[in-house]
Amino acid sequence: MADNSGTEGEEEDCSEAERAGGWFMVEAIVDRRTGDTISSDEDEEDEGEDMVDFIDDRPIGDGQEVAQELLLQQAAADDDEAVHTVKRKFAPSPYFSPVCVPSIEHELSPRLDAIKLGRQSSKAKRRLFQLPDSGYGQTQVDTDTGPSQVQDGCETGDQNGRQQYKEGSGTKDGENGSQEEERAGGDGEESQPLSTETEKGACGVLSILKASNQKATLLGKFKEQFGLGYNELVRHFKSSRTACVDWVVCVFGVYCTVAEGIKQLIQPLCEYAHIQVLPCQWGMTVLMLVRYKRAKNRETVAKGLSTLLNVPESHMLIEPPKLRSSPAALYWYKTSMSNISDVYGETPEWIVRQTMVGHALQEVQFSLSEMVQWAYDHDITDEGTLAYEYALIADVDSNAAAFLASNCQAKYVKDACTMCRHYKRGEQARMSMSEWIRFRSNKVQGEGDWKPIVHFLRYQNVEFIPFLCAFKLFLQGIPKKSCLVFYGPADTGKSYFCMSLLKFMGGVVISYANSHSHFWLQPLSEAKMGLLDDATSQCWSYVDTYLRNALDGNVMCIDRKHRSLLQLKCPPLLITTNVNPLEDDRWKYLRSRLQVFTFSNPCPLTSKGEPVYTLNDQNWKSFFQRLWARLSLTDPDDEEENGEPSEPFRCVPGQNTRTV
């Protein structure tokens, strides 16, 4: 009989078992393939039972993955808690000051924190704050025996957690309440909440700092630590926006490591730093005298140090130092040499000036003559200008520094301006017109061009030679030739021409609007040249009635306020007008006293609105230098040969130099 194994024969004599057995026997026999290499480290008897569960082919939703996911979540929670514990140990919280650190014992074990080894005194003590009356008749002494309930930011989270726990389970609330009552002694007295214990720690300090007299608490702590008042070292700025370079900063509740690190962190921001670090029950107290590279206000300083020190701004005292207090300067100087201070940078000049022996010897008494000499050299006769400008040089001038330290500054300024005006008036009265023009020319810086003045006169159809002759007699003060009148319509440059000349000569302006006063001519007594601008018909009538002798160039009498009458020769006078005084018969007696020049053409302007012909001090200086001989002005070399002094005026006493 043929072998039908592995075929699909249909013979009836072949049973199902035989046909099926043939297939299974073939598969069972072929258990090893030809050419396969079996590793020596494998077990020949290994049937692969350990790889049965390698592929998870369980149906979804049988409930076993819930336990596995829960295990993973618990492991992750344990890891996070371990990391959080390490962080709390080595990295302080950025949201709380170290004054909250003592409350950690209470948070971890409130019952252990309630145990006290010492006795709590029942005597009444002086309180900085008055406790509110509870309404149950307890006295202040009774209230003092038990801690008061204070809710601060550092305990809010724990209290909220306990409250939610009690509200969530009513049965446990009752059980806990009975247990606490038994621990308290079983006398039925209601136990204090757990949050009341935190006030005994450093969190009570936060409640004090948040009170209305927070600054008083900090000032008291400062005096307790440093032995002197904070206000003795600083001056007060009412506004927090006022900028200053030097600041005195005291910070409370700083971590020890941060307090040591601020000595290096503050150096790139400032030019000078004086730092003192002292321990305190709130943490470390840092006192700094800082000179920043740029001026800062109180808000900027507070924000910067709050970031560096990790302390809220409410724990800081920030004020500028006293710059003129010798005790304050001596404190900073002496503490800088001790071992409790770390100093960086160059000592500020206000400390050096008040502590060093050399600078102390250089302090001199204020001399009014030096102030007058300075005002004379800078041509300052106004009191406000003198006070401000002289105060600016106090850092480089010892007399100015003594002036600022004086209590009579207003008197000194007034006296200095008065004396300076007297010297200027005497100097001007002594000079001739030639000397005065030379004196004014020496004060003008730069060189100009005299041609624009000549071109402007020609543009107005004014002959230059007749004008030059009249101007020569005008400067010499010849009788009836000492008044020049410039007549013409509006916008012809009359006032522009006269004002430029008056500015160069240092003259004065009188106005007919003040003619109702007896003293309106008083400025003419202190000038070499005057100007009456825009004379009207009423003004010409007044001049014809009262000022004929003034136009003559003779001696006249002038009334001065709070002074006696003064007799003087009227200085050369310029008058601008829109009325021709030579054409009106009412003023016929003024015709021989006036020299009139007519400006008939409008003053030309550029596209920018500036005059085409520039009339400034430099051009007038060039004009006088060019026409010095034509105007018959005296040569300065001739004046020195006649014995006139060539040295500048000096009002400060000194020693005469003698040649050996």
Curated annotation (Swiss-Prot):
Compositionally biased region (Basic and acidic residues): 169-186
InterPro entries the UniProt entry points to: Helicase_SF3_DNA-vir (IPR014015), P-loop_NTPase (IPR027417), PPV_DNA_helicase_E1_C (IPR001177), PPV_DNA_helicase_E1_N (IPR014000), PPV_E1_DBD (IPR046832), PPV_E1_DBD_sf (IPR046935), Rep_E1_papillomaV (IPR016393), Znf_lg_T-Ag_D1_dom_sf (IPR037102)
Region called DNA-binding region, residue ranges: 197-363
GO MF, one annotated term: DNA binding
Entry EC no(s): 5.6.2.4
Transmembrane regions listed in the UniProt entry: none
Catalytic activity of the protein: Couples ATP hydrolysis with the unwinding of duplex DNA by translocating in the 3'-5' direction; ATP + H2O = ADP + phosphate + H(+)
Biased composition range(s): Acidic residues: 39-54, 635-644
GO BP annotations, alphabetical order: DNA replication
Quaternary structure, from the entry: Can form hexamers. Interacts with E2 protein; this interaction increases E1 DNA binding specificity. Interacts with host DNA polymerase subunit POLA2. Interacts with host single stranded DNA-binding protein RPA1. Interacts with host TOP1; this interaction stimulates the enzymatic activity of TOP1.
Family stated for the protein in its record: Belongs to the papillomaviridae E1 protein family.
Protein name: Replication protein E1
Biological source species: Human papillomavirus 29
